[in-house]
Amino acid sequence: ESNFKIGMAIR
């Protein structure tokens, strides 16, 4: 789940 949030933030 953490990766998902990080991917959206990096985008």
From Swiss-Prot:
Keywords: Disulfide bond, Ion channel impairing toxin, Ionotropic glutamate receptor inhibitor, Knottin, Neurotoxin, Postsynaptic neurotoxin, Secreted, Toxin, Voltage-gated sodium channel impairing toxin
Primary subcellular site in the record, as a coarse category: secreted
Tissue specificity field: Expressed by the venom gland.
Gene Ontology molecular function, alphabetical: sodium channel regulator activity; toxin activity
Entry annotated with the keyword Chaperone: no
An example Gene Ontology CC term for this record: host cell postsynaptic membrane
Post-translational modification: Contains 5 disulfide bonds.
Subcellular location: Secreted
Domain text: The presence of a 'disulfide through disulfide knot' structurally defines this protein as a knottin.
Function: This insecticidal neurotoxin targets two types of channels/receptors. It reversibly inhibits the N-methyl-D-aspartate (NMDA)-subtype of ionotropic glutamate receptor (GRIN). It inhibits glutamate uptake from rat brain synaptosomes, and blocks GRIN in hippocampal slices. It also acts on sodium channels of both insects and mammals.
Family membership noted in the UniProt record: Belongs to the neurotoxin 03 (Tx2) family. 05 subfamily.
Name under which the protein is recorded: GAMMA-ctenitoxin-Pb1a
